[in-house]
Amino acid sequence: MKVEENLSMFRAKTILAAVLLLIVGSGGFSGPVSAQTPKALTPAEQIAEIAILAAGSRTVLNQIRRNGIERGRISRIGQDGRSEDTRYEMRFVRGDKTEKDKVRIDNKTPQSEYSLVFGDGKIFGIINGSPFQPRAEATADFISQQAHSLDALLRYKENESTLASAGKDKHQGIDVFVVDLTDKANRKTRYFVSVKTYRVLWLEYEDTPPGASTPVKYMKRFYDYRFAQNTWLPYRTVLTEDGKQTVETRILTVTYGVKIEDSLFQNPEAASTTNP
């Protein structure tokens, strides 16, 4: 594991040096600019591109993580301080952009089993084989988790998001780059990227839940990065709301490149209409 990590960091830093060399070299170019001249990367884009390389490279991520199955456990802490565990299985097929992704999350709690499905820009639920409309809070949470995620940075170019550098900072002795991302829906996320490893250590954002009048400050921290099929993935994620931990997600297994049937993302009502 240590050898793989060192190789990954060596590759990322080597590419970083090459990128910086290209940028510096292009600065002294005084000839006419053609339509084919590549656009120079901004400081924020440089950081994001190296983070993508450190995670496995855009090509590898697009190929390996095109589809897959992730299984794990979610622990939610209620206002009374009690924790409720949910087992989940997430199956997904990536599109060219996040909005074209297909995602199905099957949840199992001690009280019930249900699924949330995102496809064709719509979200619906399934319980006992019948569709239902999820609560506004559940829908908003689903959308928020996709919009303010690690993948949102790794896929910023595909999603046509804009990046801006907020400088460099130090938190608890750790040097980090600070990158602000704004997506096409004007949702904003701030990422804190390790200067040493170029991994995203945590992200922050604000959102106003349905029915609330004031925004909530969210922080999502990433731990336990592991090597999975030539890509790096955090196996533990902790979400806090206004400084209080509310959700902890642990990945148990993840497998990429498996065939996912398209019928899994189809609304049962639409399926019965299509196939009477």
List where the protein language model places each region.
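Gly/Pro-enriched, hydrophobic low-complexity segments
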Residues: 172-268
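N-terminal mature ectodomain segment of secretory-pathway/periplasmic proteins
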Residues: 38-40, 46-131, 162-165
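Sec-dependent N-terminal signal peptides
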Residues: 16-22
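Acidic/charged, solvent-exposed loop-and-adjacent secondary-structure segments enriched in E/D, K/R, S/T
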Residues: 124-151
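C-terminal segment of classical bacterial N-terminal signal peptides
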Residues: 23-32
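N-terminal secretory signal peptides that target proteins for export/translocation
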Residues: 1-12
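Gram-negative outer-membrane assembly/targeting C-terminal domains
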Residues: 266-276
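Short, conserved active-site entrance elements at the starts or edges of catalytic domains
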Residues: 142-180, 201-203
